[in-house]
Amino acid sequence: MKTKEMSEAIGVNPTTIQRWTKYFKIDCDVTEQGHFLYTEKHLQLFKKIKRELDEGKRMKDINLNERQGQGEPSVPTKQYEAKLEKMLVQVDALEEKLATKADDVVSYQLLKHRSELDEMMKLVGTLEDRLLFIEKRMMSHHHQEKQVVNEHTPKKIKRGPWRSFMNLFAF
């Protein structure tokens, strides 16, 4: 049924039918030329809209959701449930892959940190060995220096006790 036929059946202008279609977002078929095609369900819907407007309701106060929901669902329930189940299985598989990937990343990071710690421990060991070697060299060098200093220091000349006593009162 075209817009003009629908308007004649209800008793309103064709532009009113078009305005109601857009305002209430009524689903209907559209021809290649852009003309709306309505069914018998649409006729009943438009009659209810006209009746409520005639009763004094404003267009924004008219609720069509309950009336439009009376038809059959667009997808059969069994088909919907099967599709939903398939999607849930896919979501579970993705979650499992994500968990596995996260475990792999953590394992890799732990191995990387462990190898870095091993390298640092080797470096610390090498530095410790070098430090001990340097300390030994310094100690042996220090002992040699002491011996050389002891050999080259002149022995003190002994002076009498009066000389020390006199040095105390020297100005």
Curated annotation (Swiss-Prot):
It comes from the Bacteria. Transmembrane segments: none annotated. Its main location: cytoplasm. Belongs to the RacA family. GO terms for molecular function: double-stranded DNA binding. It is found in: Cytoplasm. GO terms for cellular component: cytoplasm. Keywords: Cell cycle, Cell division, Chromosome partition, Coiled coil, Cytoplasm, DNA-binding, Sporulation. CDD domains: HTH_MerR-trunc. This is Chromosome-anchoring protein RacA. Residues 3-23 bind DNA. GO terms for biological process: asymmetric cell division; chromosome condensation; chromosome segregation; regulation of DNA-templated transcription; sporulation resulting in formation of a cellular spore. Required for the formation of axial filaments and for anchoring the origin regions at the cell poles in sporulating cells, thus ensuring proper chromosome segregation in the prespore. Binds in a dispersed manner throughout the chromosome but preferentially to sites clustered in the origin portion of the chromosome, causing condensation of the chromosome and its remodeling into an elongated, anchored structure. Residues 77-105 form a coiled coil.
